Amino acid sequence: MIKQRTLKRIVQATGVGLHTGKKVTLTLRPAPANTGVIYRRTDLNPPVDFPADAKSVRDTMLCTCLVNEHDVRISTVEHLNAALAGLGIDNIVIEVDAPEIPIMDGSAAPFVYLLLDAGIDELNCAKKFVRIKETVRVEDGDKWAEFKPYNGFTLDFTIDFNHPAIDSSSQRYAMNFSADAFMRQISRARTFGFMRDIEYLQSRGLCLGGSFDCAIVVDDYRVLNEDGLRFEDEFVRHKMLDAIGDLFMCGHNIIGAFTAYKSGHALNNKLLQAVLAKQEAWEYVTFQDDAELPLAFKAPSTVLA
């Protein structure tokens, strides 16, 4: 059978919090089968757990948060969640000694390296996928996102930013998902923001960790980072990275075709909640062997070496 995945060993890294600008220690721990993805704040006494759950997601101006019933939150979970989706990690406990996951370089790549360093372990329990059975679409003005049935996982994302630096690059990106494709084509794409917004937020004591080290920064005309872009179309690739993380908030890889126009964290989450709320639109599936498994989810040699 296709088995659930966790880590082989505990790994740790430090980074800076996007909101506070303070050092954050991140610890990734293996977890038993059917634990799911658990985010944990160890700066609170007692520590507070936040299971990845579409209904717990709140979209703020700067990031995605998970919020519990007592209104306690953990922030900036989206890029790490994308790395978990990319490598198909089903069970993990993610600890931080702060209210937020460190921003690292603004992409998912540092988290991918950390997960690969921990090693991927297979558990003796069937991996559950969410398979889309009916088309589900959500809209917000001219923005929309939808899932259609498809035996694999494809993503097709279009952005529409009126900016010289972004107009010059492609505003649409489509891919057949796989762990290899995610690592090579998506994981290194960084988040982006306007210099004037960062300066304004920092003047109000917000976004204190925001810098050229953790984002693509643009003014009204150009990219300000000395090293430029990692991809010509890094902006739309990062929006796809965000979507992969947002859609994995159900804790399972999804089998279906995702298409979006001008979508963001809030609309991606609205789509996920709409799918899960419509019982006839999806089902849990497991696979007995590799031959049945959609190509998208076959483990690359780098992951299970």
Curated annotation (Swiss-Prot):
The keyword Metal-binding is assigned to this record: yes
Reaction equation(s) it catalyzes: a UDP-3-O-[(3R)-3-hydroxyacyl]-N-acetyl-alpha-D-glucosamine + H2O = a UDP-3-O-[(3R)-3-hydroxyacyl]-alpha-D-glucosamine + acetate
GO biological process: one example: lipid A biosynthetic process
GO cellular component, one term: membrane
Involved pathway(s): Glycolipid biosynthesis; lipid IV(A) biosynthesis; lipid IV(A) from (3R)-3-hydroxytetradecanoyl-[acyl-carrier-protein] and UDP-N-acetyl-alpha-D-glucosamine: step 2/6
Active site annotation, chain numbering: H265
Cofactor: Zn(2+)
Keywords, alphabetical: Hydrolase, Lipid A biosynthesis, Lipid biosynthesis, Lipid metabolism, Metal-binding, Zinc
GO molecular function, one term: metal ion binding
Pfam annotation, one family: LpxC
Entry-linked InterPro entries: Ribosomal_Su5_D2-typ_SF, UDP-acyl_GlcNac_deAcase, UDP-acyl_GlcNac_deAcase_C, UDP-acyl_N-AcGlcN_deAcase_N
EC number assigned by the record: 3.5.1.108
Residues that bind Zn(2+): H79, H238, D242
Keyword Lipid metabolism in record: yes
PANTHER family with a match to the protein in the record: UDP-3-O-ACYL-N-ACETYLGLUCOSAMINE DEACETYLASE 1, MITOCHONDRIAL-RELATED (PTHR33694:SF1)
Family that this chain belongs to: Belongs to the LpxC family.
HAMAP family: LpxC
Family annotation (NCBIfam families): lpxC
Function: Catalyzes the hydrolysis of UDP-3-O-myristoyl-N-acetylglucosamine to form UDP-3-O-myristoylglucosamine and acetate, the committed step in lipid A biosynthesis.
The protein, known as: UDP-3-O-acyl-N-acetylglucosamine deacetylase
Organism listed in the record: Citrobacter koseri (strain ATCC BAA-895 / CDC 4225-83 / SGSC4696)
